[in-house]
Design a protein with these regions (language model features):
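FAD-binding core of FAD-dependent oxidoreductases
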Residues: 78-92, 96-100, 107-132, 160-182, ...
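C-terminal auxiliary extensions adjacent to catalytic cores
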Residues: 26-47, 51-58, 62-65, 70, ...
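Conserved, non-catalytic sequence blocks in retroelement Pol enzymes and Pol-derived host proteins
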Residues: 136, 165-167, 397
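Cysteine-centered functional microenvironments
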Residues: 159-164, 341-345
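Glycine-rich, flexible loop motifs
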Residues: 26-74, 104-157, 251, 266
Length: 515
């Protein structure tokens, strides 16, 4: 009996470990809330996708309802038994409904410009699968499962950045994402770009036969904009945290004052992000010898003194934008909306990108400000004041030191200012004026992506400067947290004694922020 109990215990342990391992490596698509953090985890860790039983049932139920409605009625349903856009009054015969969907995908694949980065295309696939799984779109189960096959097998549809107006959904990029389902378009697989038909043959997959409405379900949606937004939010949270840490190092290197971060000051103007940033700065600088030494100056420049007010506003903006995008990625955003429970098929406007276009513009403005204030601190560090040598080099004149790092930061910051001009202010009517207001949210997404990368570059340049400046304060030391950050940075980027080629070191600083 004892041996039997022991064997059962071991078997149960092995089964538990196996289940836990499977669950850890597989994310089940369901109606449960999908967080932005979970999306990041799925992409970063290569977690596989599978449909939950409930999701399968919802997809099948919606498809069955739609088929029954088409069979039972001759009443035109937009995009299901009619043409698209301003052709909505042109009725299509039932024997041409599948071809209608393929024609839609082919004709709408008009993307130009650079490719959407692979990481963002993978987010796009995940978000499209999630949206279709709610059972309001009318997709067939095999269509959704093939999208999951693409995701799990590392098949990346080739999608181009430009072409979407961000209303009627992201028609152009989602057309490129969807073409490989039917053996058209291109994919990247194992680092090689190939025709989708070749990939299907390689995998032994048959092209999907689209049913009525499926092309619309795939193309009408905000998943291109949303995927850029999710990626940008994940980076924005990382950069916001780094901005505080780097500002703390810059402040100590500049012989700045700690008093502006006193809690009492911020309690009388209690914006959440401001309070958080002030507390974070105090925490980062706790134990610093430099911060405790007597100060000659009464005040610091705004770029140091107002870190809580500026960085804090960025935090609050990130928080707001995150709440909007969180709702968006847990929504069905195509048209028409099929509601089996309510016995309704309604042509409406859930594809319109305005709810996320404005927040993406807002986030681009916020991150641009994070870069703006960072560049101002860089300027202070290289200006030869408060006991620091001009351009942070021991022998200025013979050496130019960090002079041009500030030029680079200023150039990038200036570019950000133009990129942060809101795209959502613009609207150009299309489709014979049937689509007479559009969000331009896809343009907001593209610009936000660039602003994120530019802001990262400026913060990396500030860290490069701050680490150099801090060493001119030795043997006095900053706080344990700042000194550990400095120590880790020095493993990647050395102190600069005499002039060297700087751009590889800036790139190393950028990579350091990504670790």
């Amino acid at each position: 009996m004892a041996n039997y109990d022991y064997l059962c215990t071991i078997l149960n342990y092995k089964i538990t470990i196996s289940i836990n391992k499977t669950n850890h490596m597989t994310h089940y698509i369901s109606a449960e809330h999908l967080s932005i953090e979970r999306v990041g985890e799925i992409i970063e860790k290569g977690i596989k996708l599978a449909l939950s039983d409930d999701a399968k049932a919802r997809i099948q139920r919606c498809r069955k309802y739609l088929d029954e409605q088409i069979a039972a009625s001759d009443v035109p349903v937009y995009g299901v038994t009619t043409g698209f856009g301003s052709l909505c009054n042109v009725k299509v015969s039932k024997d041409q409904l599948s071809q209608l969907q393929i024609n839609l995908m082919m004709s709408h694949a008009c993307g130009v410009g650079e490719r959407v980065p692979n990481e963002i295309v993978r987010i796009m696939l995940l978000l499209k699968i999630q949206s279709l799984s709610y059972g309001y779109s009318g997709s067939k189960l095999d269509t959704v499962e093939r999208l999951i096959d693409f995701f799990n097998e590392g098949v990346i549809p080739v999608v181009y950045r430009q072409g979407s107006l961000g209303a009627s959904g992201d028609l152009v990029p989602l057309a490129h994402m969807s073409l490989p389902l039917v053996g058209l378009g291109e994919v990247e697989y194992e680092g090689k770009v190939m025709p989708a038909a070749e990939l299907l043959k390689l995998k032994g997959w048959e092209p999907i036969e689209l049913a009525s409405k499926e092309g619309l379900a795939l193309l009408n949606g905000t998943q291109n904009m949303s995927s850029f937004a999710v990626w940008s939010l994940l980076q924005a949270e990382r950069l916001s945290d780094w901005a505080d840490k780097i500002a703390a190092m810059s402040l100590d290197a500049y012989d700045g004052r700690i008093e502006p971060f006193t809690e009492a000051v911020h309690l009388v103007r209690p914006h959440k992000g401001q309070l958080e940033t002030a507390a974070h700065m105090k925490e980062l600088l706790t134990g610093s010898e430099l911060i405790k030494q007597p100060k000659v100056h009464v005040q610091d420049p705004y770029s140091f003194r107002c870190v809580p007010q500026v960085h804090g506003t960025v935090k609050d903006t990130i928080r707001y934008v995150k709440s909007v995008i969180d709702t968006e990625i847990n929504s069905a955003t195509d048209n028409p909306t099929v509601c089996p429970d309510d016995d309704l098929i309604i042509s409406a406007g859930n594809f319109h990108g305005e709810p996320i276009a404005m927040p993406m513009d807002f986030l681009a403005i916020a991150l641009s400000e994070l870069a703006n204030i960072s560049e101002r601190r860089i300027y202070r560090l290289v200006s030869g004041t408060r006991g620091l040598p001009s351009f942070l080099v021991a022998n200025p004149g013979l050496n130019s030191g960090f002079m041009i790092t500030q030029y680079t930061a200023a150039s990038v910051v200036s570019l950000n200012k133009s990129l942060a001009a809101p795209s959502s202010l613009d609207s150009i009517p299309s489709c014979q004026d049937q689509e007479d207001h559009v969000s331009m949210g896809a343009n907001a997404a593209i610009k936000l992506y660039k602003v994120v990368l530019n802001t990262e570059r400026v913060l990396a340049i500030e860290l490069f400067n701050a680490a150099q400046a801090l060493e001119f304060r030795f043997p006095k030391k900053s706080s344990p947290v700042v000194m550990k950050m400095h120590e880790d940075f020095r493993k990647e980027v050395p102190f600069i004694g005499d002039d060297v080629i700087m751009y590889p070191l800036i790139e190393k600083a950028i990579q350091f922020l990504r670790k």
